[in-house]
Amino acid sequence: MSKYGDSMKIVWTNGCFDVLHRGHFEMFKYAKSFGDQLIVGIDSDEKVRNDKGPSRPHNCVEDRKFALECIKYIDEVVVFSSREGLEQEIRQLQPDVMVIGSDWKGKNVVGEEYCTELKFFDRIEGYSTTSILEKSN
């Protein structure tokens, strides 16, 4: 049984969320529309460095977590440090809906087997953390 109760519809999404931009906010709004509770998983600093390179993250995990907790669509934020940790979080939560970027269509999505429904969010043209950071350098 979920800690949110049987009647609550749980939605999960995850990512780095290093430099927040409109695309992220639109995705959180989209994700929240599918349920009562939106749980967001974020990569630890070490995982971001391993995945994106030594100059990342731009913001530390504490700051990224705090920023996400201030967003009205998000009900809880959890930190994970590995693919296995991500899978464990999703397995324990057993979300009704998982929302991920449409660039994951046709790929093996971590934790997909533990959710009831998988929804894809299309990237909003012109919004990218990488491009924001490149412009600022």
Per-range role (PLM):
Residues 1-137:
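Nucleotidyltransferase catalytic core that binds NTPs
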